Amino acid sequence: MLAQFKHRPLATILFAASAAFAWATGAAAQSGEPIKIGYSMAMTGGLGGNGKSALLAQKIWEEETNAKGGLLGRPVKLIYYDDKSTPSEVPAIYTKLLDVDKVDLVIGAYATAMLAPAMPIVMSKNKVFIGLLGLAVNSEFNYPNYFVMIPSGPVPKPAFTKGFFNIAMAQNPKPTTVAIVAADQEFSRNASDGARENAKAAGLQIVYDKSYPPSTTDFGPIVRAIQATNADLVVVCSYPPDSIGMVRAVNEIGYKPKMIGGAMVGLQATAIKTQLGALLSGWVNYDFWLPVPKMQFPGVADLMAKYQARAPGEGVDALGYYMA
């Protein structure tokens, strides 16, 4: 889905942050005190599965960096708190990291919905901020010290579903109509904005374009409403709990559009793929990294081996392709 962009291991975000710190402080900063890197991370709640997977990769980076002597002759220390997959928890966490823990660097929480509420806090301190898989978070803030690790390029909103539409428009006969459904939260709004752009660029008629509350658990009525439009394509912009709910509802109702999927977070996880099994047959969704020859960047195989060896004991995603 995002094949035109390269994806590097998650540990790269920590390397980039530490490199920025080294550049800013110079050799005079060397001492025995640890370089503290702070952030919030979803360890529970709907994003907890992905968040814990990311955390394991970050711990591996911390251990390896310290084993090699740290940075600037100083050890590194990760300081993180569970944001419970709840945006309202995030501002207090970043305030504590900066004002109480006195961290040297802040990096992003996992996911768009958690990054956005951190931005005003980080901006008020004029800190460099490197986000983790946030879609178009900076489009409203325009903060010059914000960077993000997500392979969606300089125009992120349409890039996220560009691959979906490219595949759809290669069909013969070409589709003519599309339905867009999204959770009413930051990521899904941004992804659906991009889907709208792609649909218009492709000359598709948008026959359904609605959002649903993030607390939704019954997706049957939504699927039936989309089915009634007879849309050729269905773009779903969702986080893990609703991605699962949408897949189950589509299969239970027996709805079969020409193509469905697009921007569904969660379907990349090994446990969710195993849980849904054959119900995922026919869905077209994005991923960031898979173990194919062209994506075997230096260091990836070593990181994957270490991650996968520790994953069972940590109770995280067995493969780690999406978050590690």
Where are the language model's segments positioned?
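Short, low-complexity disordered leader/linker segments with a strong preference
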Residues: M1-K36
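Residues that mark the start of a beta-strand
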Residues: P34-K36, T176-T177, D232-L233
